[in-house]
C-alpha cells in the first residue's frame, strides 16, 4: 500500500506552498525564507555531487538540528509552528514541520521528494490498527534513480522540546533513512502523498495580481 500511494501523489496549490513556507503569506516573506532554505541546502550539501548522498546529508542535518515539539503536539498545533520560516528560527516543530523543511531543502538541491500523510504506531495505535487508524503523522519519500527512498526525520531524531526545555533523550539513528518498504510497513501506513513546489510559491502572488 505504501508504494502505491507514492505513485499517485496529488498536486497541491501555490497558496499551500506559500503557507508552508511562512505564515505571513507575503511575497517578500516567502522569498526571504526560500533564500534561507537555498543557502542552508547549499551549506549542507557542500561538495557532494551524488544525489543519494545529498539526500542522506539533508536528512541527517534535519534530524540532528530540529527538536520535536511535544508542547505543541499536546496542544493545538498552529500554522506558525509548522511553517519553514519559524522551524528554522525556533529549531522546533512537529512532524509536518520536519517534513516541510526536509522536502524544501531537497527541492533546493533539485531532488524529487513528496510529503506523505498517514498513520504510525503510537501509544494509542498498534500494528493491527495501522490500516484503519487516524492520520497522525507526516514523513517523506524521495525518488532517485527510479527508486523510492523513505525518509522519516522525526523517527530518526531523539531531540525533544518539552516543558519549555530542549533535551536529548538518546543518540539519533538513521534507521528511518532508506528503510525497506517491508520494515516501514510494520509501523507506518501511508494514506496520501503530496507534491509541493515551494520554490514556485511566488505563483500564488502572481495569481492575485491577475
PLM feature segments, named:
Residues 2, 11-16, 26-27, 78, ...:
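Serine/threonine-rich low-complexity intrinsically disordered regions
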Residues 2-91, 100-103:
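Secondary-structure boundary elements
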Residues 99-180:
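Hydrophobic/aromatic-rich core segments of domains that either
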Residues 160-210:
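Alpha-helical and coiled-coil interaction segments, frequently adjacent to or embedded
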Amino acid at each position: 500500500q505504501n508504494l502505491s500511494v507514492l505513485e499517485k501523489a496529488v498536486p497541491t496549490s501555490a497558496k499551500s506552498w506559500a503557507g508552508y513556507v511562512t505564515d505571513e503569506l507575503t511575497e517578500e516573506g516567502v522569498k526571504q525564507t526560500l533564500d534561507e532554505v537555498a543557502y542552508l541546502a547549499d551549506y549542507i550539501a557542500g561538495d557532494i555531487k551524488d544525489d543519494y548522498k545529498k539526500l542522506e546529508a539533508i536528512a541527517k542535518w534535519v534530524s540532528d538540528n530540529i527538536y520535536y515539539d511535544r508542547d505543541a503536539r499536546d496542544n493545538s498545533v498552529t500554522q506558525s509552528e509548522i511553517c519553514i520560516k519559524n522551524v528554522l528560527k525556533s529549531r522546533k516543530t512537529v512532524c509536518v514541520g520536519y517534513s516541510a523543511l526536509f522536502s524544501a531543502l531537497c527541492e533546493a538541491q533539485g531532488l524529487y521528494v513528496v510529503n506523505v500523510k498517514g498513520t504510525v504506531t503510537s501509544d494509542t495505535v498498534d500494528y493491527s490498527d495501522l490500516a484503519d487508524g487516524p492520520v497522525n503523522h507526516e514523513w517523506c519519500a524521495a525518488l532517485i534513480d527510479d527508486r523510492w527512498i523513505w525518509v522519516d526525520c522525526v523517527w530518526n531524531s531523539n531531540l525533544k522540546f518539552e516543558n519549555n526545555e530542549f533535551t536529548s533523550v538518546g543518540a539519533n539513528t538513521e534507521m528511518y533513512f532508506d528503510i525497506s518498504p517491508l520494515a516501514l510497513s510494520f509501523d507506518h501506513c501511508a494514506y496520501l502523498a503530496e507534491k509541493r513546489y515551494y520554490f514556485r510559491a511566488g505563483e500564488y502572488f502572481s495569481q492575485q495580481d491577475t
